[in-house]
């Protein structure tokens, strides 16, 4: 995350974020013995980058953003930022992934909600505490287009089909 983002005014969130930034990794930064990841969003009104540490909910290289705000009646401020600017990045350990956040509905939301509650059981209590349906986003990774030099370097002689796909 090359561009410096704004820290949260909330003390515990700011402390978690500062620890991650100082260490250069999310490894070892936890809430209730559960790992967290660090999302970077863009402010809906300010356009400034914002850090959002959230519980780690991951499946097959995709990450969920659960807008629980501890079961508060209102969505967290980052929810509105992501709705306005869905280009988001996530740091997991020392790896950073960029993608597009998409709010989930129906069966897909139910699936990711199950994963979220398994990763951090208090989410279930938060949902009981509020009248709003807690939103869940999934971060869809950006496609990675390999340069021919990278493919040749990483993979000895791609087959004809792969070579054709790479040229297209």
What do these predicted regions represent?
Residues 1-10:
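Polybasic, low-complexity association/targeting segments
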Residues 2, 125, 129-168:
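C-terminal edge-of-domain segments
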Residues 12-34:
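Short, basic/aromatic recognition patches
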Residues 28-29, 55, 80:
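Short secondary-structure boundary/capping segments
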Residues 33-70:
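Short beta-strand segments
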Residues 38-40, 89, 138:
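Residue-level detector of beta-strand face positions
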Residues 68-123, 129-133, 141-143:
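Short, structured beta-strand-loop surface elements
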């Amino acid at each position: 995350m090359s561009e410096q983002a704004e820290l949260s005014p909330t003390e515990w969130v700011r402390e978690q974020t500062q620890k991650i930034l100082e260490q250069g990794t999310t490894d070892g930064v936890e809430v209730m013995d559960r790992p967290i990841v660090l999302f970077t969003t863009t402010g809906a009104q300010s356009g400034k980058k914002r850090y959002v540490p959230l519980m780690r909910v991951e499946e097959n290289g995709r990450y969920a953003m659960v807008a629980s705000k501890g079961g508060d009646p209102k969505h967290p401020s980052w929810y509105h930022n992501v709705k306005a600017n869905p280009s988001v990045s996530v740091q997991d350990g020392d790896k950073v992934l960029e993608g597009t956040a998409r709010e989930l509905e129906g069966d897909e939301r139910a699936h990711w909600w199950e994963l979220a509650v398994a990763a951090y059981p208090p989410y279930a209590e938060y949902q009981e505490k509020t009248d709003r349906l807690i939103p869940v986003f999934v971060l869809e990774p950006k496609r990675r287009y390999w340069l021919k030099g990278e493919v040749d370097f990483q993979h000895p002689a791609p087959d004809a089909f792969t070579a054709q796909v790479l040229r297209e």
